[in-house]
Amino acid sequence: MSPVSPRSLTLIGAGLAGCLLAILLSRRGWQITVYERRGDPRIKGYECGRSINLALAERGRHALRQAGAEELVMAKAVMMRGRMVHPLVGEPQLQRYGRDDSEVIWSIHRAALNVALLDLAEQAGARVHFYRRLHTVDFDAGYARFIDDRDDQPHEIHFQSLIGSDGAGSALRAAMQRKSPLGERTEFLDHSYKELEIPPLPGGGFRIEGNALHIWPRGRYMFIALPNDGGTFTVTLFLPNAGEPSFATTRNGDEAFALFARDFPDALPLIPQLKQHWEEHPPGLLGTLTLDRWHLDGRALLIGDAAHAMVPFHGQGMNCAFEDCVALADQLDAHDDLASAFAAFEAARRDDAGAIQQMALENYLEMRDRVDDPEFLLQRQLEQQLQARWPTRFVPHYTMVTFLRTRYSIALARSEIQREILVEATRGHSDLSRLDWAALETIVHARLEPLDGAH
């Protein structure tokens, strides 16, 4: 049994959020111990059930700065200026995310980021134990039992409080549910995903534009590619579970090859191992997790995907989890007891987590159905014009979510107003030449207050 220190916390899960939280709290004087069910990725290679490449935005970078980790992480990241949209017929077109290269996002491979944060967590003083799968928890006595799956040996610890940073399939959440129901609900999409890879050129370098997120939108399904710093692309096909085409009708490598030849012909020669990878990589599920509460008084708390998992279509799951880490560290500084800190953390983050979950679902429809739609493209043009004219009032949705740290709930509310303005102003128009700009100025000033941080 391990003794408990006065200012100690036990983290379950040494993934991205767990490692970042360990850095932040260790630097603030907490004694942090982390338990991870898998092995050390620095020794045995990286294993992860969900390895979609990560899009690092300003929210995530801000959290990394707080932890002194930004410089190390950014050395491994690749800039993405926008979406490179590949139509079925015609040339790819770049849709910029922002106004210039100061408004971009960054692609980073999950494994590289996890290893970097793990190193920094240990350097900050956190102790990390691998091959420790949470088995049972006695919340009243403050004891937890872990199992080493290599030899089935149990390991018991005494804890002051547990923080669940162990992802959407959280073992701590399951233990909390057994103690006191959390009102857990998971809504799965009727789509799943499969991950593939575009290798680098024989001499190194990218086979397609390296500073973009590539999208092949095809209505009810799509294919995306995110760059890595080694010249590869991590590519992901999102496909319905039933219907035509779907995972039900694309069961093997030959059927996958036929699908790509028909619907993604320019991508097919980029993926020489398509058939092999298709049969080796099982489809991954996509879902949104909601809970009625995230904590068990001061004894346990869930953060990140363990509390509010979301679909990956806004590139904000990691960024949101990193914001959680900073918010929790701040609440622990502000309160003398854990129960108050946990309650304040949940109160501060709940509405924002729900908002980004909703926006992530909406962004899937945009990426899949609308990026090549003429009405949507006209609205994008108007959005850029309105931002240029009134940059502190009409702040594009993507800017608020990705380049600023506007609260997600505020970004959602403002985005809904702005969408109404764009739809109404462009209705019946094929271009912007006949718009009533004076009327638009009145509407924008009446409905949108200046936004903090916008420029």
From Swiss-Prot:
EC number, UniProt record: 1.14.13.9
Ranges in a coiled coil: none
Keywords: FAD, Flavoprotein, Monooxygenase, NADP, Oxidoreductase, Pyridine nucleotide biosynthesis
GO biological process: anthranilate metabolic process; kynurenine metabolic process; L-tryptophan catabolic process; NAD biosynthetic process; quinolinate biosynthetic process
GO MF terms, alphabetically ordered: FAD binding; kynurenine 3-monooxygenase activity
Residue stretches spanning the membrane: none
Database matches in Pfam families: FAD_binding_3
Pathway: Cofactor biosynthesis; NAD(+) biosynthesis; quinolinate from L-kynurenine: step 1/3
Cofactor: FAD
InterPro entries: FAD-bd (IPR002938), FAD/NAD-bd_sf (IPR036188), Kynurenine_monooxygenase (IPR027545)
Catalysed transformations (reactions): L-kynurenine + NADPH + O2 + H(+) = 3-hydroxy-L-kynurenine + NADP(+) + H2O
Major enzyme class: oxidoreductase
Family: Belongs to the aromatic-ring hydroxylase family. KMO subfamily.
Role this protein plays: Catalyzes the hydroxylation of L-kynurenine (L-Kyn) to form 3-hydroxy-L-kynurenine (L-3OHKyn). Required for synthesis of quinolinic acid.
HAMAP family documented for this protein: Kynurenine_monooxygenase
Name listed for the protein in its UniProt record: Kynurenine 3-monooxygenase
Phylogenetic placement of the source organism: Bacteria, Pseudomonadati, Pseudomonadota, Gammaproteobacteria, Lysobacterales
